[in-house]
Amino acid sequence: MDILDSKWNCSVCIDSRQGGRPENQDCYACADTPIGFAVVVCDGMGGGPGGANASTLAVQAILQHLNSCQPSADVQAALKNAVGSANSLLRQTVLDHIELQGMGTTCVVAVVNGKTATVAHVGDSRLYQVRGTKVLFRTADH
């Protein structure tokens, strides 16, 4: 578990557990970007081929996209484009490496700027907003 603080006045806790699988395919990163403090968590799907690669590539692609944004960029559009960019990279990687057919990852991204957190997510990795002991918000699996 990591607890991280940033200049954006937020604390982040990321919990990564291997569970019953032979390999932990989680990848996560936090970074100050031009549009806010970004937290990205990806989990390779189902222990399948290339899951660890998929989660790592997705985190890197998302942060690269967010870091290329102008400070005035629309955060919602930036998140949509960042996740789309990661998806395109994963699709191309599978085309280039047929042995990775079926690889994929879940994804949760939050960008905090001031008192606003903008969230994008795909799959069953969750984001929780907690204040004290109360869960204020949780993403729904899809």
Regions found by a protein language model. Name each.
Residues 1-142:
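PP2C/PPM-type serine/threonine phosphatase catalytic domain
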